[in-house]
């Protein structure tokens, strides 16, 4: 398995691998209205060039891995727009193509940059539900149903040339198990799995992280694991817990230091000082994090700050 692991060569040479940050935040800054169940996947349909620009900005900021704009891109989601599975898979493949084109553009500017990766985003079934389920994990499907949901996107991402998969924002143990088993049908595929949490020791659905790690230890295609899309202040304790459970590289890409007001549906600074991702870098590294980036509300400036501190 190790010879097909795209992370290994990079992590053998450097302490951390920088991921990118939020896609949606940057698209909104460019005038996109993402008030839609498809979220940033909507832009794959309407204005894909903007996605390439965002990827390029993150590479320029220091990211070594772009995560595709396919988190909410599924045939089930696109069906509401009247697209069939073939059309949906073509759009999912487009998300990889856009990231690859951004990589090509950055390498043309910086031929000495070295290896850059493209990770295909595989968001959870809860993201398709578009009701916050990815932060609760309180949904239930059979293994077959979960795999039927994920299979077309996994195939499209791999066929389009993603270097690995980012199976991310996963809140549900049964879905994690189904997705890990699905990967065995694609033996050359490699993935990281990252989770949303109820607390530092439990998945959002309440499953102990110890049980999740034990499950994934049986799937060598999973080459890193960790956490994403959680509050910045909750990251270190969770990483410390995971570090005691696995020898795999740990992944962390939390939300910005802002806090979300569910009533007004707006983000706000908390107190006089809003913590930044880079403030946490030393403690994340001490807790075993090797793949580090940002999720909601983070920007190329956040990745540049991580780069400056690393």
From Swiss-Prot:
Annotated ranges, domain Hcy-binding: 1-310
Protein keywords: Amino-acid biosynthesis, Metal-binding, Methionine biosynthesis, Methyltransferase, S-adenosyl-L-methionine, Transferase, Zinc
Chain sites annotated for binding Zn(2+): 229, 295-296
Gene Ontology biological process terms in this record: DNA damage response; methionine biosynthetic process; methylation; S-methylmethionine cycle; S-methylmethionine metabolic process
InterPro entries per record: Betaine-hCys_S-MeTrfase_BHMT, HCY_dom, HCY_dom_sf, Hcy_S-methyltransferase
Record flagged with keyword Zinc: yes
Cofactor: Zn(2+)
Keyword Ligase attached: no
EC number from the UniProt entry: 2.1.1.10
Catalytic reaction annotation: S-methyl-L-methionine + L-homocysteine = 2 L-methionine + H(+)
PROSITE patterns per record: HCY
Name of the top EC class for this enzyme: transferase
GO MF term (any one): S-methylmethionine-homocysteine S-methyltransferase activity
Coiled-coil residue windows: none
Quaternary structure and partners: Monomer.
Task performed by this protein: Catalyzes methyl transfer from S-methylmethionine or S-adenosylmethionine (less efficient) to homocysteine, selenohomocysteine and less efficiently selenocysteine.
Designated name of the protein: Homocysteine S-methyltransferase
Organism listed in the record: Escherichia coli (strain K12)
């Amino acid at each position: 398995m190790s010879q097909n692991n795209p992370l290994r060569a990079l992590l053998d040479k450097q302490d951390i691998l920088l991921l990118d940050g939020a896609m949606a935040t940057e698209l909104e800054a460019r005038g996109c209205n993402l008030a839609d169940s498809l979220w940033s996947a909507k832009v794959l349909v309407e204005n894909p060039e903007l996605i390439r620009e965002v990827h390029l900005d993150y590479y320029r900021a220091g990211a070594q891995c772009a995560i595709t704009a396919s988190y909410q891109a599924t045939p089930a989601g696109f069906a509401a727009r009247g697209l069939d599975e073939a059309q949906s898979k073509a759009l999912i493949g487009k998300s990889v193509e856009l990231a690859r084109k951004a990589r090509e553009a950055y390498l043309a500017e910086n031929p000495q940059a070295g290896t850059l990766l493209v990770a295909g985003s595989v968001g959870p079934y809860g993201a398709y539900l578009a009701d916050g389920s990815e932060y609760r994990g309180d949904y239930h499907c059979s293994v077959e149903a979960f795999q039927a949901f994920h299979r077309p996107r996994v195939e499209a991402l791999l066929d389009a040339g993603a270097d690995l998969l980012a199976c991310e924002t996963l809140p549900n143990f049964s879905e994690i198990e189904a997705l890990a088993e699905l990967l065995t049908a694609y033996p050359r595929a490699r993935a990281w799995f990252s989770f949303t949490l109820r607390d530092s020791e439990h998945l959002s659905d309440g499953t102990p992280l110890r049980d999740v790690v034990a499950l994934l230890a049986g799937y060598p295609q999973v080459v890193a694991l960790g956490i994403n899309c959680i509050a910045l202040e909750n990251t270190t304790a969770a990483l410390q817990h995971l570090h005691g459970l696995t020898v795999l590289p740990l992944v962390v890409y939390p939300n910005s230091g802002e806090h979300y007001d569910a009533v007004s549906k707006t983000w706000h600074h908390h107190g006089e000082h809003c913590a930044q991702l880079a403030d946490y870098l030393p403690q994340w590294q001490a807790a075993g994090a090797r793949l580090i980036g940002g999720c909601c509300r983070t920007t190329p400036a956040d990745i540049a700050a991580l780069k400056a501190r690393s």
